[in-house]
């Protein structure tokens, strides 16, 4: 949970006394109209909650809806189920009740209003995982409740968004491969299907550039179609690299299976890294080195922001980027000169 904002914090930002802040927020005389408006605007931006009001609002119970696209619930796609569980647990600890709705691919295309929204059952909505901008725009117009995006952002339809640092994370794990002696490194993920995949590709690309390498089309390998349906098998390139950077652990798992079918051993012949540091136990017989997503921190921020919006204490919209960690396991072999 974020640290509570105090009057002193606002005063320090504006270079005025705490007494001036108190007078402005309580409507007392002694503060110019211009300064009063400036203080109120900054207090709202910083998420300040007046004493007493905060306690009263925190004791309220809210209903939070979670909307998850159908294609994130396909076989073995466990990351979003786990993230939903973490969000739900976090919300329950904040005195909230959580309901989930799975949005079918057809309903997304048809711009169908979710039942959670149509039935006015919720006080706030979490959109978990990327959806089409047209659908998000419809939600913005029809859902008269605060909305927070989790694990994606949208430039066309801006709401508060909580994401992992995909750009830096993939940059870091690609550099990790370079530190292990790899120079021929491929990327596995269909570009432009989601902003997350594209951001991760750009992090991979930055690492290559800094090592004097250029991206090659032959080593940009798709893992799903443009409708975001994941392939069961990853098609290997004709000319093989020594390592693959995958946009997620599930894709890394499928790649490892494809490699083994073609007679390659991981990591003895080819190294593979992923992203998420989460995969269903027993799904892959190789422990995948990965850039881990801090789900707990993402959930805390998402619930905290949504609560402030439901309570009316936050109206500005922002992008919250959560750092992750390198999870070094057994899918990378160091190359020796």
What residue ranges belong to the model's regions?
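Alpha-helical recognition/docking segments in bacterial nutrient-uptake
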Residues: 1-2, 59-175, 234-239
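N-terminal helix-turn-helix DNA-binding module of bacterial transcription factors
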Residues: 1-60, 336
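Short acidic/polar active-site loop segments enriched in Thr and Asp
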Residues: 17, 49, 123, 182-185, ...
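Hinge/beta->alpha junction and helix N-cap segments in small-molecule ligand-binding domains
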Residues: 69-82, 100-108, 162-172, 188-231, ...
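Short helix-capping segments at alpha-helix termini
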Residues: 93-94, 208-215, 238-239, 261-266
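Short acidic capping loops at alpha-helix termini that bridge into adjacent secondary structure
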Residues: 183-184, 215-218, 266-272
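Flexible loop/turn connectors
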Residues: 231-337
